[in-house]
Every structure is written in structure tokens, then in C-alpha cells.
Regions:
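Serine-hydrolase catalytic machinery in alpha/beta-hydrolase-like enzymes
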Residues: 33-133, 230-235
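Short alpha-helix in the alpha/beta-hydrolase fold that links the catalytic acid
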Residues: 76, 200-210
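Alpha/beta-hydrolase fold nucleophile elbow
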Residues: 135-146
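Short beta-strand immediately N-terminal to the catalytic nucleophile in serine-hydrolase-like folds
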Residues: 143-145, 169, 191
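Gly/Ala-rich beta-loop-alpha elbow adjacent to hydrolase catalytic centers
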Residues: 145-149, 153
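A conserved short beta-strand
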Residues: 162-172
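Short beta-strand/loop motif that positions the catalytic acidic residue
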Residues: 184, 190-192, 196
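C-terminal catalytic histidine-bearing segment of alpha/beta-hydrolase fold enzymes
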Residues: 212-260
């Protein structure tokens, strides 16, 4: 292996130790695939729980990126379980529907962007499934999402779903016509890069104005010079280790304040 390759590997391993992304799952973490049905069709979520924290653990509902539920969301769920948050990664596409490229990701996410009622129904069904998992306190819930999932958790907020908090990582912020945040019941945290072309700062300002108008309890952390998908380890140059670590700490603080 070339020296450059060794240096890159060392950097990745160091980052993994800081974030926990490269660690073997601890023995006390229970993890399982969970198949559930919506309108007679199967969906496959993923559940992680740390047995060391006992029963009635606060719940995190994790919504996947536009390429569907994969190893990224599973690792994030494990990381949250290690901190004492039972985590259910919801499936919005259906069992076996896992986009393999950009075109397929656009197609699957586009179906739900175009049909918000279906998006809401699948989110609500995933939430209900998560709340009845063993060891979970279904009355203490925060929903988080990445990219497409970041937009989806804001859909949950506008729908008035009974959740204590909503966290959007590098999501998109367009509010469909006829919707607003007047029914939002929980706190909102936005974690975003200032150079995100998917949701530029004008969109951030618009979102803040909409939530202000609805008297929503919200906070925003903006990471200067940071691109879209900054927490995604496989996103190449868009990945930003510092912003990833900052946003992870912000999430843990939010969870501690909201559902601990």
C-alpha cells in the first residue's frame, strides 16, 4: 500500500475512534431487523437498544437518506443506542426497495415528495411500530433525519405528530402549499451547512421565519463553508469531520434536554 493510502487509512481510523463509526458493536447492544406492514405491504426497519440501560429507554426515530435504509443509518442507530437511546430506523420505501444509484434514489424519494399524505402515513406507521418495541418508553420520542430524512422529520413536525423533538441534518426545507408549522408540538433543531446547494441560506431564513410565525421552539446551528451531506462518511469531499462531530454533540445535547 502506498504511503498516501496508509495516511488516509489512519485518518479514517482516527475519525472512527472519535465518532464511534469504526468500532465493533458492543455485546450489550441488541440489534434486529423489524418487518412491519403498512396497507398490507411489508417494510423493514432496524432497531438497536443497549441492554445496559434497562427498560423504558427514551426513543429516537431515525429517518433515512434518499437512498433508503442502509448501513449508515444502522451505524448511527448503534451509536445512539450506546448512549442509552433506543433507536428505530424507519423504512419509508418498502422491504427490499433500496436504491442503487442517484436515479433510483431520486425516483423513490420523489414519489414521497409528490405525495405528502403517503409520506406522513408511512412516518406515522413507523413511529407507531417503534413505540411498541420492547424496552422503549414510547412517550419520550425525538425524530431525527439525514438529507431526505431531514425533510421528512419536518413533515412530521408540520403534521403535528406527537413527538417531543425533531432534528434535521442537512435537510431540505420547502414547505408545501397549504402547510405550515402551526400544529408542531415538539422542539426543532436544524443542523446545516452554509454552502449547502440543496437548501441555501435563503431557504434557512425562510424556514426560520415560518417557525417564528408559528411560535415554534427551535434552534439552528449553521456550519460555515460546509456542504450538503456533511455527516455522511462516504460522501467524499462533502464530508466534513469537524461539522460531523459538532452536529453529533449538538444532537446529544438536544436529546439530553428533551427526552432524558
Amino acid at each position: 500500500m502506498k504511503k498516501l493510502g496508509l495516511m488516509a487509512l489512519a485518518a479514517i481510523l482516527t475519525l472512527g475512534m472519535v465518532l464511534g463509526i469504526g468500532q465493533v458493536v458492543r455485546a450489550d447492544i441488541v440489534q434486529e431487523s423489524v418487518v412491519y406492514t403498512i396497507d398490507g405491504q411489508p417494510y423493514e426497519g432496524y432497531f438497536a437498544l443497549n441492554q445496559g440501560f434497562g427498560n423504558n429507554q427514551p426513543l429516537v426515530l431515525l429517518v433515512h437518506d434518499w437512498n433508503g435504509l442502509d448501513s449508515y443509518e444502522m451505524r448511527r442507530a448503534q451509536m445512539l443506542a450506546e448512549q442509552g437511546y433506543a433507536t428505530f430506523a424507519v423504512d419509508l420505501y418498502g422491504q427490499g426497495v433500496r436504491p442503487r444509484n442517484t436515479e433510483e434514489s431520486q425516483a423513490e424519494s420523489g414519489k414521497l415528495y409528490a405525495d405528502r399524505a403517503t409520506m406522513r402515513a408511512r412516518l406515522a406507521a413507523g413511529l407507531a411500530e417503534a413505540q411498541q418495541m420492547m424496552g422503549v418508553d414510547g412517550d419520550r420520542v425525538v425524530a431525527i433525519g439525514y438529507c431526505f430524512g431531514g425533510a421528512a422529520v419536518l413533515e412530521m413536525a408540520r403534521a403535528g405528530m406527537d413527538v417531543d423533538g425533531f432534528v434535521s441534518f442537512h435537510g431540505s426545507f420547502e414547505t408545501p402549499e397549504g402547510q405550515d408549522y402551526s400544529q408542531t408540538q415538539g422542539r426543532v433543531l436544524i443542523l446545516h451547512g452554509s454552502d449547502d446547494p440543496v437548501a441555501p441560506m435563503a431557504d434557512v431564513a425562510q424556514l426560520a421565519a415560518e417557525m417564528d410565525a408559528a411560535d415554534v421552539d427551535f434552534d439552528m446551528e449553521i456550519y460555515g463553508g460546509v456542504d450538503h451531506a456533511f455527516t455522511v462518511w462516504t460522501a467524499g469531499d462533502r464530508y466534513d469531520g469537524l461539522a460531523d462531530r459538532k452536529s453529533w454533540r449538538a444532537l446529544l445535547t438536544f436529546l439530553g434536554e428533551t427526552i432524558d
